[in-house]
Amino acid sequence: LASSAASDVYKRQMDKIVEVLKRFQAVEHRIEYVTEKRGVKFYNDSKGTNPDAAIQGIRAMNRPTLLIGGGYDKQSEYDEWIESFDGKVKKLVLIGQTKEKIAECAKKHGFEDVILCDTFEEAIDTCYANAVSGDAVLLSPACASWGMFANYEERGRIFKEYVRNLAE
C-alpha cells in the first residue's frame, strides 16, 4: 500500500514536471528555436556576440548546421570558434565588416564551405536555399550587431520575422 501511494505521488509530480517543461520558453535571442520550414529548423542566437558565446550555440546543435556569422569588428580572434565547428557546421554564411577576416580564418583551419553575403536577408535566403530537410540554420554571429542593427535584439527580431515569412 505504501509503495502504491508513493508511486501515485511520484506520477503526479512527474506529470507536473512534464507540463512545466512543455511550456518552457528559451531566453529570447539565446539559442531560441524559431520555426521549422521544409524540415529545416531555425535558431536565433543573436546574443552570441563574441566567439566564446557563439561556440555555445554551435555546441547546442544536434543537426547539420548552416551558420550565419559576422558583423561589427571588435578585433576578436575567431580560431576557437572555427575549430568548434567540428563536423557540425556544414556551411558558414558571413555578413558585415568581419566577413573577409572570418573567411580567411576559416580557410586557415581548413574550413572552405564559406559564402560571403552583402545583406542579412541574403544570408538567410542563402542558408535556406542550401539547407535540406534535417538541417538547422543558426544565427550565432560571434560579432556585435553595430553598423547593421541597433543591437543584438533588433538583429534577432528581424531574423525571426524574416524566417517566419519564408515560403514553404
Each model region followed by its residue ranges:
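Single conserved hydrophobic/aromatic residue that forms the stacking wall/gate
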Residues: L1-A6, Y10
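ATP-dependent carboxylate-amine ligase
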Residues: R12, E19, R23-H29, Y33-K41, ...
